[in-house]
Amino acid sequence: MDHHAQHHPRSHACVLPNGLRLHLAHDPAASRAAAWLRVAAGSHDEPSAHPGLAHFLEHLSFLGGAAFPGDERLMPWLQVRGGQVNASTLGKTTDYFFEVTAEHLGAGLARLIDMLARPLLDIDAQRREREVLEAEYLARSADEQTLIDAALALGLPAGHPLRRFAAGRRDSLALESDAFQRALREFHAAHYHAGNCQLWLQGPQTLDELERLAQRACADLPGRAPGASPPPPPLLPFACEALALRLPGPPRLVLGFALDALRGADEQTLLAFAELLGDRSPGGLLAALGEQGLGESVALRVVHRDARQALLALTFELFDGSAAAALEAAFFDWLGALRDDAASLLAARRPLLAEPTAPLERLRQRVLGLPAEIRPACLDALRADRCLRLHLDSELDGAEARWSAGFRLSVAPVAAAPPLAAQRHAWRFELPLPPSAAAEGALFLRWRFPGVPARSRFLALRQALRPLCGQARLGGVEMGLEALGEDWSLSLLGPRDRLEAAVRPALARLLAAPPDWRANGERLSSAERRRSATGLPIRQLLDALPGLLGEPLAEVDDWRRTRWDALVMQAAMPDPRWMPGQAAGERLEPLPPRPGRHRRELAVDGESALLLFCPLPTQEVPMEAAWRLLARLHEPAFQRRLRDELQLGYALFCGFREVGARRGLLFAAQSPRACPARLLEHMETFLQRSAEALAQLPARRLAGLRKALADDLRRAPGSFAERARRAWAEHLGGGAGRSRLLAEAALGLSGDDLLAAQARLLEARGGWWVLSSRR
């Protein structure tokens, strides 16, 4: 064993005898574990004659390996145990990752290694999976982010691999060809071996235990020396300075930057830069853009990363397309002011980058090499003369069809214009307050309306709160307003001695809405609808569903008919005189069910999509426990039936979900070939036939599923923020201690209980809410 690498009290790195590089993280407070395996090969390494081969192999791997086929393969095995799993194929890497309860980490890792080392590659399964890739390609052909990336690739030098087709589709995957099958196996043999892989493991197990798990599971991964990877081709010079892309949604400006002197963990600096960029405090960039009527928001994204180079995209949402030049000038003026003291300003933002609580997200940060030092020099390449401008507009004169990265775009050239000189602005970079010595506290406030308030009203008030949220964040307080159908909630988490200073002005702002809130709300609502239109049809339906589960409220501009309740943890209750609405006096009960079938349609372009949401028929603990267990049983079967057997599409799922203020079973599907009525028919048939499978469920398997569900429900949250959010979820769902009661009920569930719960589901006792695209 080669123990030459880094040592840390809670982490350790080593190399296994077969050459696999291993990174271990001991997380003693965790109850769940996670694994992340990276293959140092991706789409840019595949043979040019077979575009999509790397992505296709990623899909095929999930169909199982020699030791764990069928329902024992990783994905369905994890789903019934409440785990999560996914994968991602990029240009130079392919990642496979999952999380599960700690006791199942070893068994999950064995399945992961089996499917990567010994994929079955059955030709009939390949044909079925090729249709899944075709459905994924068709869905991505209308996906905003995919099309933006393809348009940015048009600006790169000719021959850069980002301009090649890599997603894969039916026509690019010649399964019947001996040459393709040979290339598939050669690609697997060349790259899926221990010397070309790294594995990260994280869990409550000791470092020695984690290492033993890896040794046992990874012994069968073939050992070979890592191959040398050629340096990536340069991103510069850009093929053009500016381009316009026709895309639904509000007008936007994307500034693309080529970075070519990055170091391994410069993502830390990019995260700090994104935090500073998105600051809504007075005097900052977003505040100035809003005051000048130029822009609404900004998002930073790494489009491509390979060795020392990256393509960075900053997307600004504009109030009007004509504001692009002025906005760009303001951004570079702000950036120039930032550079005067970049090191201290970026370092000051680092404490605001809260450590993620989700196991997979924590492990992802380790994969990225985080936490790491701030290095402002990596931002030196953000210059106007190294910038590719992409204008996004729903209406574009003179557009022509062009293909890039395998996707058809509607683009137009943009004449180079001399940079607009910005008026020098007195930029203010607010510094975070020193850390507080006080304990953390939490405050959750909820208002219940007699119906679903107008979306425009919520958006106007949320925007009015944003400067206050920005100020609170500088003091370590996370504050946000959320719409949950008939309920609105305001949440605050942070040092208990700073909560009152944050909540009091926020409540005053809610009571005294800005005088222009109606007009501003309508503008924001219109922009949100246009923004939503750029997403996948299934995503548009998911965004709309919470607001459709209740009766719309006639427009009001006061709080007189609202009732409120609250949950306070390690903090002081706000003075009731500050609060909008009337105190409920006790905890507001969950909303009552609305039995029967309710059908809504939404005008959505693109493929057919349909959601079926079945809220709980009662708030009884045994009923909810049974429905949660039903969800775990239905999830892999739903995927197998609709995705694998019926070949309906790529985007589909089912599970137990919270939708607005209601909880229940949610089924979702998007299809390029089946109409909404047909999708609903397939879902109904699936649910009707599921009773037969439930009746035949072996007692031993039921016992294992009961225990896995109970263990998840009893899982103790690690951080205070996790404990507070769980307490709030219990408050909304029926009261304190509900998770413990659900765990106890889960352990007592019988097969007859599941059959009874399935019958209640089929009878629509809690309601069947069907939301579909209009076809």
From Swiss-Prot:
The keyword Magnesium does not apply. GO terms for biological process: proteolysis; pyrroloquinoline quinone biosynthetic process. The active site is at E58 (proton acceptor). Pathway: Cofactor biosynthesis; pyrroloquinoline quinone biosynthesis. Binds 1 zinc ion per subunit. GO terms for cellular component: cytoplasm; periplasmic space. Its cofactor is Zn(2+). Its EC number is 3.4.24.-. Keywords: Hydrolase, Metal-binding, Metalloprotease, PQQ biosynthesis, Protease, Zinc. The keyword Metal-binding applies. Gene3D superfamilies: Metalloenzyme, LuxS/M16 peptidase-like (3.30.830.10). It holds the Pfam family PqqF-like_C_4. Zn(2+) binds at H55, H59, E136. InterPro entries: Metalloenz_LuxS/M16, Pept_M16_N, Pept_M16_Zn_BS, Peptidase_M16, Peptidase_M16_C, PQQ_synth_PqqF, PqqF-like_C_4, PqqF_C_3. It comes from the Bacteria. GO terms for molecular function: metalloendopeptidase activity; metallopeptidase activity; zinc ion binding. Required for coenzyme pyrroloquinoline quinone (PQQ) biosynthesis. It is thought that this protein is a protease that cleaves peptides bond in a small peptide (gene pqqA), providing the glutamate and tyrosine residues which are necessary for the synthesis of PQQ. NCBIfam families: PQQ_syn_pqqF (TIGR02110). Belongs to the peptidase M16 family. This is Coenzyme PQQ synthesis protein F.
